[in-house]
Regions:
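Catalytic phosphate/metal-binding cores of nucleic-acid and nucleotide-processing enzymes, i.e., regions
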Residues: 14, 35, 44, 48
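Residues that recognize and position ribonucleotide moieties
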Residues: 2, 40-41
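Short, solvent-exposed alpha-helical "recognition" segments
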Residues: 26-33
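Polyanion-binding surface elements
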Residues: 1-23, 52-53
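A short, Lys/Arg-enriched interface patch at domain edges and termini
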Residues: 46-61
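Short Lys/Arg-enriched helix C-cap and helix-to-coil transition segments
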Residues: 33-39
């Protein structure tokens, strides 16, 4: 299991940190994992599944 940093997630999904926060608040993005008082991360598998879901939607008729 791998945890991605905010920078890694923004590079992977090509969204700004602010947009990711809005999606999280709306329940449309994987939840962050608190790592410390000022540090968060995301499970890589959840981010990859989120991307795959978008790809499946793209391919739907």
């Amino acid at each position: 299991m791998r945890i991605l940093s905010k920078r890694q997630v923004t590079e992977l999904v090509l969204y700004s940190p602010q947009h990711i926060a809005r999606l999280e608040k709306a329940g449309l993005f994987p939840k962050r994992v608190p790592l410390g008082p000022n540090r968060v991360g995301w499970l890589e598998i959840e981010i990859l599944e989120w991307i795959e879901e978008r790809l499946r939607r793209r391919d739907e008729p």
